Amino acid sequence: MQIMEPFESGFTIYSKSGCSNCTKVKKLLIEKQFFFVDISCDEFLIEDKEQFLLFIKEKTKKDYKTFPMVFKDGKFIGGFDDVQKYFDKLLCFDENEIF
């Protein structure tokens, strides 16, 4: 079983069927006009769930088992709530503001 690595550019979403937060995070990224790659994990979960979770643990550096699993530029962000927080932090900074 070959699992795609998180992309080094843009957002990578590991999702599964029937996951409402997976749908929400994709909708949010579309609304914000961000490029993302969606990797459906249904097959991985059926074929070898243990191997998939070990792969995710290696990438996230934690025991993360909930969907979606979202990465930005190859770095783990978290799930839907974490992506919302990520965008909230971006909005806190005005790009024209000088520090």
Regions found by a protein language model. Give the residues of each.
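Short alpha-helical
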Residues: S20-N21, E47, G78
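Thioredoxin-like thiol-disulfide oxidoreductase module
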Residues: C41-D63
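Structured beta-strand/turn binding interfaces of compact recognition modules in eukaryotic regulators
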Residues: K16, D42, D73
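Catalytic phosphate/metal-binding cores of nucleic-acid and nucleotide-processing enzymes, i.e., regions
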Residues: M1-Q2, K85
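Non-catalytic, surface beta->alpha helical segment in thiol-disulfide oxidoreductase systems
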Residues: K72-F99
